[in-house]
């Protein structure tokens, strides 16, 4: 096939083709597909476009053409593909077959379509151009997301801050901050002391007297304390050492007697109650 294509491109072959076409009026393909009103001509122009696409696809396979020539050929092929689609729509409008459904799929043979790039395709050596190869590389899968249990397994003392002092950085900083804070407190105490001295000796004497008499006890307080001690002694004298506690049997007998009295008061007459009381008294109960 390559040998036949080379023969067709020789000067003799082109001269012979020009001789055969002399005297014929070469019909030019309409710029717009909508200008064609005949179905056979629309089919003819579609076949012509497919032939041009095939020639350019064969040329673009040669990687030695150079980057700019390969890009131009790829643009021309995409332009012809769009034009072919217009003629297929026009053929369908004129009552012809729907090549969009019944036509062969050309993506696998003619080029790869970049997703989201409005149908622009790359053919032959154009797939290996700088910046194009990366478009067809698959993105690496994101790392699997760890569950909460897996994250908790990796938690140690360092997570809670127990090892912060081992880095040798935080301890010197804390010591420096502590020195600074102590110096500030000392300066504050000195300023307060100087302010107290500036107020006068009288206030100092009053403060000293208050400090001296802070543990002084008045007569009223001493009397109250004495009365409390006496009261404590009286309470100790009145304390009863032993209180007899009734046994379980004595409690049951008392309950039985109480129940009997309630029944007698409820059902017996006054005369019968008086007789029973007298009998109990005589018997010694």
From Swiss-Prot:
Pfam families: Isy1. The keyword Acetylation applies. Disulfide bonds: none annotated. The modification Phosphoserine is found at residue 247. The keyword Acetylation applies. GO terms for cellular component: catalytic step 2 spliceosome; nucleoplasm; nucleus; post-mRNA release spliceosomal complex; post-spliceosomal complex; Prp19 complex; U2-type catalytic step 1 spliceosome. Residues 203-226 have a biased composition (Acidic residues). One of its GO terms (molecular function) is RNA binding. One of its GO terms (biological process) is mRNA 3'-splice site recognition. Residues 194-244 are annotated as: Disordered. Keywords: Acetylation, mRNA processing, mRNA splicing, Nucleus, Phosphoprotein, Spliceosome. It is found in: Nucleus. It comes from the Eukaryota. Component of the spliceosome C complex required for the selective processing of microRNAs during embryonic stem cell differentiation. Required for the biogenesis of all miRNAs from the pri-miR-17-92 primary transcript except miR-92a. Only required for the biogenesis of miR-290 and miR-96 from the pri-miR-290-295 and pri-miR-96-183 primary transcripts, respectively. Required during the transition of embryonic stem cells (ESCs) from the naive to primed state. Belongs to the ISY1 family. Identified in the spliceosome C complex. Component of the XAB2 complex, a multimeric protein complex composed of XAB2, PRPF19, AQR, ZNF830, ISY1, and PPIE. Identified in a pentameric intron-binding (IB) complex composed of AQR, XAB2, ISY1, ZNF830 and PPIE that is incorporated into the spliceosome as a preassembled complex. The IB complex does not contain PRPF19. Interacts with CPSF3; this interaction is in an RNA independent manner. Interacts with the microprocessor complex subunits DGCR8 and DROSHA; this interaction is in an RNA dependent manner. This is Pre-mRNA-splicing factor ISY1 homolog. The lineage of its organism: Eukaryota, Metazoa, Chordata, Craniata, Vertebrata.
